[in-house]
């Protein structure tokens, strides 16, 4: 039998749009693994996903597994039979497992002895017999957080299932999947094309669905069409569509036959901050906003219909009517909120709990204000502006706009602060206090904003760790991992002179007696250093490079970064491998010694030329490198230390360290300790592999 194309399509009710891609990709990965594990050879595997279907098409699928020879060695002959030649229980159990009797077994003779042997020719199973279970298993492994049950059956899936199509070439594979008997029936678009039709051959998919069912099953093709049509629609009205990836993905997952249309809203709504209008259009309505070439929002939006209407004007008008009340709400909230100053909301923060043991949002803003001022002083920012921004940082949470449109927190604080006449860096800080919100997000743009962003995150870290509620496993309800990484990114990428030790101590101090964890400072610092590990691994640094720096526990993030770059560069040097090995040897020698070493190397005790040369080099470099260490010039320091390779190699080749002469032994150990201390000023080089 020749290879054939295999098709599986699961026809469902509307699938969750934000999960559609991951469901389809996981389905493809699961089926691929099942085929490979079963030894069924195949060609390209394509996945298809639309709101009411998941499908896979496998090219050149083998008709069956290859036949194979099976050999199973049993017990040694000496243990397979007793003195009378009767099979032992071990032999009988082995034979039973192979489906034979002991006397049917062959014997395997080698130079090491003789064993019972089972040998068989196993015929490969057909793909038709294997596929139903493979598909069922693959569907059961999909990442579905919440399953549904429908009708009177006990079947569970992400959404109710109506059709299951299993075709191998032109043959239907009989099976019951998710409670549905397989067939060659496929359902088309709800309102266009044929509602239901049969497919004769797997190779006809997805073209037959496009032509007869009016469904673009190819997810990437559908997405590309929406993107291209939306860009063209925006160009026609002299603008650029805001086609954010997340919304583009969601809209792609909502439609089977995308028709891009352009609509408008009243220009008076442009007086409302663009962020609020965009939040309404994108978040609530799944519309694409349109911007002019100068970056200003236009009174237009682009949306995607799931039907090709004979009267698109009606659809456009309907969407304009839907969005208008939402924009009118935003306008009302904006005008109402501006009747009060931001600071007028401070008393209401006392009514909102931050955390049961840690007090209210007003308590938190007071701490943020003081900590922001302290940080500003450390980094040379405007202390008064930072303190003011910290005090106002959560006031916009009490406004009507943010209550209704929660994602506008921060940005509305900025607009209201500008309206109140606050300093510009204060206003900007209110918006940027939450940055970076995710990996790769922008950092705060000015020093005051940096101070407030760090203060907000450090207050949360200190408080939650201070009551013993640090993240456990995958659970991180207060987003402490994101907060820690955000603080580190700001300090490193803005090159701020902040020390995690004093920063954490100050954040903890501001809580007074609210915290119950006596180890809170150390735990917060260790947690943040752990975030460094994840960050630098993502940046491509090797694990041992990170461990070498972490071993020194540097608490200044900018200093940590400088050490990482220095060690990474050191690894490119020709002497790096030998020096890492030498450091490891020195470390092991010192670890095995329990003797009290000298504070200084006694020059008079030195005997061998090689130890004299090494001692001299250590003294010279110690003095020479002190300014390097003080200024954080770690890369230059390690380059200088790399020059020690030859004298270190010569020392270990010619000099015995653990000699019987105690004074000589201790002097040599002391010299090695001084040598190791030089490298440890940067990192623990002995940990490099």
From Swiss-Prot:
Question: From the UniProt record, which GO molecular function terms apply?
Answer: arginine-tRNA ligase activity; ATP binding; glycine-tRNA ligase activity
Keywords carried by this UniProt record: Aminoacyl-tRNA synthetase, ATP-binding, Cytoplasm, Ligase, Nucleotide-binding, Protein biosynthesis
The reaction(s) this protein catalyses:
tRNA(Gly) + glycine + ATP = glycyl-tRNA(Gly) + AMP + diphosphate
Top-level taxon of the source organism: Bacteria
Where does this polypeptide localize? Cytoplasm
EC code(s) of this entry = 6.1.1.14
- GO BP terms in the entry: arginyl-tRNA aminoacylation; glycyl-tRNA aminoacylation
Q: Does the keyword Iron apply?
A: no
One cellular-component annotation, GO: cytosol
PROSITE patterns per record: AA_TRNA_LIGASE_II_GLYAB
Instruction: Please name the InterPro entries in this protein's record.
Output: DALR_anticod-bd (IPR008909), Gly-tRNA-synth_bsu (IPR015944), Gly-tRNA-synth_heterodimer (IPR006194)
Q: How does it assemble?
A: Tetramer of two alpha and two beta subunits.
Q: What is stated as this protein's family in its record?
A: Belongs to the class-II aminoacyl-tRNA synthetase family.
Q: What is this protein called?
A: Glycine--tRNA ligase beta subunit
Organism of derivation: Enterobacter sp. (strain 638)
